[in-house]
Swiss-Prot record:
The keyword Cell membrane does not apply. This is Probable transcriptional regulatory protein PP_2550. GO terms for cellular component: cytoplasm. Its main location: cytoplasm. GO terms for molecular function: DNA binding. The keyword Transcription regulation applies. It comes from Pseudomonas putida (strain ATCC 47054 / DSM 6125 / CFBP 8728 / NCIMB 11950 / KT2440). It comes from the Bacteria. Keywords: Cytoplasm, DNA-binding, Transcription, Transcription regulation. InterPro entries: Integrase-like_N, TACO1_YebC-like_2nd/3rd_dom, TACO1_YebC_N, Transcrip_reg_TACO1-like, Transcrip_reg_TACO1-like_dom3, YebC-like. It holds the Pfam family TACO1_YebC_N. The lineage of its organism: Bacteria, Pseudomonadati, Pseudomonadota, Gammaproteobacteria, Pseudomonadales. Belongs to the TACO1 family. One of its GO terms (biological process) is regulation of DNA-templated transcription.
Length: 237
């Protein structure tokens, strides 16, 4: 839960998939602004990995790349913005957004933070590590995550979000190199991005059931906003 919070969606599978595709399309478009060739654009290459994992169609993927790179006209004008603050019960979080209207997004985020506390830039980021996050699954039964982390150049590793997966943590500048090296050491990369891990997370066990439910409800409301791409939370199980 500390690396990236994921909502326990109560919506239909179709609606959930639609939101995921919309967020992935935005990320591809903004990444493609730096070039449409994934071999020369690490951010785009990583976004494509995420899109393929989510079963985005080739047509949708190509359209997002062309739109972002401006190959069919003007390039898309999405802006990356982030917000910092606290969920109820002083649980720190960083919210990353992609938006075509910053004023609209900040106004809506302020409303969502009424049950928490929206902070100034830097008010929470100091309590997180800015890192590369690579989720990977073993390609064989004898794949060793510790050896793979050492050989591929990762800083650390821990259990991943998906069952049986490993989360490799890297320096931000090493993300692309490590995710390219992991297959040589027995792991298949399923997701890779620049993100955050908490330094001093709040323990969920220290919260009452009612308090934890309030935190979860707050985080789910944030995550469901159309402009929100990632939510990083200082909370451990």
């Amino acid at each position: 839960m500390g690396a990236q919070w994921k909502a326990k969606h109560r919506e239909t599978a179709a609606n959930a998939k639609g939101k995921i595709m919309g967020k992935l399309s935005k990320e591809i478009q903004i990444a493609a602004k730096s070039g449409a060739d994934p071999d020369m654009n690490p951010r785009l290459r990583l976004a494509i990995v995420q899109a393929k994992k989510a079963s985005m169609t080739r047509e949708t993927l190509d359209r997002a790349i062309r739109k972002g790179a401006g190959l069919d006209g003007d390039a898309v004008q999405y802006h990356a913005v982030s917000y910092e603050g606290f969920a109820p019960h002083q649980v720190p979080l960083i919210v990353e957004c992609l938006t075509d209207n910053i004023n609209r997004t900040v106004a809506q985020i302020r409303v969502l933070f009424r049950k928490g506390q929206l902070g100034a830039s830097g008010s929470v980021a100091w309590d997180f590590n800015h890192v590369g996050l690579i989720e990977a699954t073993p390609a064989s039964a004898d794949a060793d995550p510790e050896m793979a982390a050492i050989e591929a150049g990762a800083q650390d590793f821990e259990e991943g979000e998906e069952e049986g997966s490993t989360l490799f943590i890297t320096d931000t500048t090493d993300l692309d190199a490590v995710q390219k090296a992991l297959p040589e050491h027995g792991f298949t990369v399923t997701a890779a991005k620049i993100g955050y891990t908490p330094k001093n997370p709040v323990s969920a066990a220290s919260l009452s059931a009612e308090a934890l439910a309030e935190v979860e409800a707050f985080l789910e409301a944030i995550d469901e906003h159309d402009d929100v791409q990632n939510v990083y939370v200082g909370l451990t199980e």
